UniProtKB/Swiss-Prot annotation:
Keywords: Ribonucleoprotein, Ribosomal protein
Family: Belongs to the bacterial ribosomal protein bS16 family.
Gene3D superfamilies per UniProt: 3.30.1320.10
GO molecular-function term, one example from the UniProt record: structural constituent of ribosome
Gene responsible for this protein: rpsP
One Pfam family cited in the UniProt record for this chain: Ribosomal_S16
InterPro entries: Ribosomal_bS16, Ribosomal_bS16_dom_sf
Stated name of the protein: Small ribosomal subunit protein bS16
Amino acid sequence: MVKIRLRRTGKTKQPSYRIVVADSRSPRDGKFIETIGYYLPTRQPKVLEVNADRARYWLGVGAQPTDVVVKLLKRVNILDEQGKVVAES
């Protein structure tokens, strides 16, 4: 199964995350298929950048986002409150 999840990068105690598409059997920071964005929670304000076209593509072909990624995708209006993909505007 293909998942959309966070891959931790950055220094100790200064995490940053890449939003990646990966096989669910791969380790958290291991092999991945594609990077579709990044999230910097330590910056003020927090920085979130997502390639909406690629995120919609992967969701359309059946990739399952993790719970945290669902919240992030809702924040950038790729998913609606029910978790369904929002049409491109």
